[in-house]
Amino acid sequence: YNGATWSGSGWTGQPLMMKWPKKVKKAMNMYDWAKEKDDLVEVIYACMDGYVYFLDLETGEATRDTLNLGFTFKGSGALDPRGYPILYVGAGYDSNQGTARVFVVNLLDCSVMYTFGNNDPFSLRGALSYFDSSPLVDADTDTLIYPGENGILYLIRLNTQYDQEAGTLSINPDHIVKWHYYGNRTSVASYWLGMEDSAAVYGGYLFVTDNGGNLMCLDLNTLQLVWAQDTLDDSNSTPVLSIEDDHLYLYVSTSFRLGWRSSSSAEVPIWKIDAQNGRIIWKTSYECYSDDGVSGGVQSTIALGKKKLSDYIYVTVAKTGAQYDGVLACLDKKTGEVKWEHKAYYAWSSPVCVYNSDGSGKVLYCSCGGKAYLLDGKSGKLLDENEISSGAIEASPAIYNNYMVVGTRDCRICGLKLE
């Protein structure tokens, strides 16, 4: 559309997975065999061809007809955390059906219950209305929390009515609250308003980065900005929350958009931030390159180690060392010291930690060179690699038990079994 071609699964492009209760499946438009399969885990994947795909995690077989929404979906969307059969997914580009928007989909029959965000006069970016973020739902208040690249944070009370026994579902959105902001260095040419990452929320406070190089803490009850920290550049990395010694910290990074800070290369820090006041605890930096339209730095979300990996964080850094090179870096949470690096083709994909029953862990990530890598989380030793695509893998993998699923730019959805 409009001279742009979008193929396969893009950034962030993480599939969603759900093991629906049998009573819920009974009311769904699934194929009969899928309804009857007791251990079915359904993969729900919105892709850049405008379709949402529904697949059996174990086999890749379609569990129901594809849903054609007619817009490019780069982001991952979200399922309702209450177990309600609702999909929230935002379009990442306009189409011949109009400007991009958010869809709220009833997964009982795949009907669209509600759309919003397109041509919003409250936007400070005109008609631009892209949504790459994954939203959150506050169960206590039945409120959808959705950041947009149009610079608006949407808070929408859904008034959800779901009767599992009857197999009925409806929403009646009202009390729609919108928040937007101005950036001191924002212009038409650079440091744009807008949020492409996803928000993190803790105790009534929302943390989000933006295209304008800001990490913001917002009080959701007053919609007052508590603090802002300079992240230097177009930031697409979702802040990751970590409680350490009864104190809340954030791990986050940024990218390098060519021409904003430099026409060649620029520093890309990885930060540990005090969530209470925005103070920088430590930073570890990489020098990164960019192509026009293909940014280096950190496009991914940092993986927080748990269990026997609880001392570490893992982050993919793109276009460092050389234009097409990158690293998966393991950093010490307390100091920011680099413990090890795995060097390969650069990656936009977020790493995922997986654990054995004894608490030992491995790290899995995918590269824009088409490979998936599995490494020991402590030593960084390469345990396995698999070239699963002849094109790039920009999307982030999702893992359920010992199955991994990821989409590729060459129009494949791949399932791998981890052993």
Give residue ranges: language-model regions.
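Extracytoplasmic/lumenal domain signature
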Residues: Y1-W11, L16-V89, Y93-F131, L136-E419
